Regions:
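Extreme N-terminal cap/leader segments of soluble proteins
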Residues: 1-65, 84, 93, 111
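General structural feature for long, well-ordered alpha-helical segments within catalytic domains
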Residues: 9-13, 34, 69, 73, ...
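Short beta-strand
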Residues: 28-31, 77, 128-129
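Short secondary-structure transition/capping motifs
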Residues: 62, 66-70, 98, 102
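Glycine-rich anion-binding loops of enzyme active sites
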Residues: 43, 53, 89-146
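Small-aliphatic-rich amphipathic alpha-helix that forms the alpha element of a beta-alpha
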Residues: 66-90, 111-119
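Short, flexible micro-motifs
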Residues: 34-36, 73, 97, 129-130
Length: 146
């Protein structure tokens, strides 16, 4: 039987959903898995953007597949970086998950996130997870350079 995130434990849960993410950018010195990411600065300007997606407001899971939602949650941030003529480099993800979601479901969400990261050569360098009384909330911060 599939476990939910509270049964697995925070650190095991994070390791499970992010195990296949790889660092692609040389500026990303330390990625997900520690207290903080380490990103090397350059002479370029850093762009920072954040978008929050809340179930029932920004998406409806009755017709939005979780993999598509994961992809979309990354792309809405990257579009802000591209709008400033920048090159996206890293993302940080925060998710609030209710107990109705099993780990398998969240892994499906992260498949979409991973697909977007691979396509646009973005590094997932950190994040946070917490429980939610109802629904799913996704918060992504994207960093880029211009």
């Amino acid at each position: 039987m599939a476990k939910n995130n509270s049964e697995l434990g925070e650190f095991s849960f994070i390791e499970k959903i992010t195990e296949n993410f790889e660092i692609k950018n040389s500026e990303s010195l330390l990625g997900i898995g520690d207290d903080s990411a380490i990103i090397e600065s350059s002479k370029l300007h850093t762009l920072v953007t954040k978008d929050l997606l809340v179930e029932g407001i920004h998406f409806d899971l009755s017709y939005t597949p979780l993999m598509h939602l994961g992809y979309k949650s990354v792309i809405v941030n990257l579009s802000d970086i591209y709008a400033m003529n920048g090159i996206p480099k890293q993302i940080v993800i925060g998710i609030a998950i209710s107990n109705r979601f099993k780990v398998d479901s969240i892994q499906e969400l992260y498949k979409g996130i991973k697909l977007a990261c691979e396509k646009y050569k973005i590094d997932l360098v950190g994040g946070d997870t917490t429980t939610s009384q109802s629904g799913l909330t996704i918060s992504i911060t994207a960093l880029g350079q211009v």
